[in-house]
Amino acid sequence: TLYSILFYCIPKGSRDMREELNVEELFASKVFTLGKMKERLPKSTYKEVKKIMDQGGELSLATADVVASAMKDWAIENGATHYTHWFQPLTGITAEKHDAFVTHPDEDGRMIMEFSGKELIKGEPDASSFPSGGLRATFEARGYTTWDITSPAFIKETATGPTLCIPTAFCSYKGEALDKKTPLLRSMEALSKQAIRIVRLFGNTEATKVLPSVGAEQEYFLV
């Protein structure tokens, strides 16, 4: 019989992380998943958000306020005091514009933490700081970030502390794509629209959306 023996060393004063790390609890613990939305949002609000995720459409400002409040409470519970619209400009790296939940003290001098649906849905970073791929004149500075409801918000932990990161698309005032995500989202929408036509030819009348998957290699065969 062949035996193998594993030796490992734990520095004095250190903890054995194997005993303390619970992968099931750690996985997505810093992500505002659908499960967390379902727990924290009213049933009607959750249904509206889920419908827009699946079928597209615009989120009402009233619903966005409810989602923003729940997202803020969750972020604060995880130690965040700031939020950022997180996007991918044409620089090859991500960009962030940080804002605080802290607004102003109340009459009793207590700190008020606020986050509105308007702040969740839309931001306005200085687009002149980022390349546009020649789409517009260099002096045009206006740019907008818009919440991508299909991508979950998450907590990013750095040396300065946790921050709520809200995945967004980055566009110009005229709707020109200034990032790498907007063309991807538009391509997915166009592909879904045409794929549904094919699905209908095969007799499926219930499907409303087709989701592409991206990998190192993807193939399909039509028989």
What is each residue range found by the language model?
Residues 22-26, 44-49, 169-173, 193-194:
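Short amphipathic alpha-helical segments, especially helix-boundary/capping motifs
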Residues 16-19, 83:
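Positively charged, low-complexity intrinsically disordered regions
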Residues 141-223:
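Glycine-rich, acidic/polar active-site loops that bind/position phosphate-bearing ligands
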Residues 5, 23-29, 56, 149-152:
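Short, mixed-charge, low-aromatic patches
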Residues 10, 78-79, 215:
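Generic structural microfeature
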Residues 25-140:
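Active-site core of metal-dependent hydrolases
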Residues 18-31, 35-41, 201, 207-223:
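Active-site-facing alpha/beta catalytic cores
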Residues 1-16:
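Short, Lys/Arg-enriched N-terminal segments with co-localized hydrophobic residues
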